[in-house]
A protein has these predicted regions:
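Residues within the helices of the helix-turn-helix
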Residues: 21, 32, 61
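Recognition helix of helix-turn-helix/homeodomain-like DNA-binding domains
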Residues: 38-55, 59-64
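Key DNA-contact positions within bacterial/archaeal DNA-binding proteins
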Residues: 32, 43, 72
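Residues within the alpha-helical elements of helix-turn-helix
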Residues: 26, 37, 66
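A short, Lys/Arg-rich alpha-helix, primarily the initiator
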Residues: 2-29
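The DNA-recognition helices of helix-turn-helix-type DNA-binding domains
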Residues: 27, 52, 77-81
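Short amphipathic recognition helices of helix-turn-helix/homeodomain-type DNA-binding modules
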Residues: 70-86
């Protein structure tokens, strides 16, 4: 972990799907319900949560609409994860 101007940055790649899972649990929304609200197959949601599928701009916009977390946050989480993972 490193610190820059009062901010803490993790050196560990955290999958955005882990954050998504934590978010839906906090809102008491199941993966099935999230998939329904986003008009996505449950398999797509599960693959995002497992880190097998990337969060695209379109998916980020849908997550913003359903969960209220801005799309740019989801995209930044995805980008950061993929950069650290490689």
């Amino acid at each position: 972990m490193s610190r820059t101007k009062g901010r803490i940055y993790s050196d560990i790649a955290i999958p955005p799907g882990k954050i998504l899972l934590d978010s839906i649990k906090a809102l008491s929304i199941s993966q099935t319900e999230l998939a329904r609200r986003m008009d996505q197959p449950i398999q797509a949601i599960n693959e995002i949560i497992e880190g097998k599928k990337e969060i695209t701009a379109s998916t980020a916009a849908q997550l913003e609409k359903v969960l209220g977390t801005p799309a740019y946050i989801w995209l930044n989480l995805e980008r950061g994860y993929r950069l650290k993972k490689n």
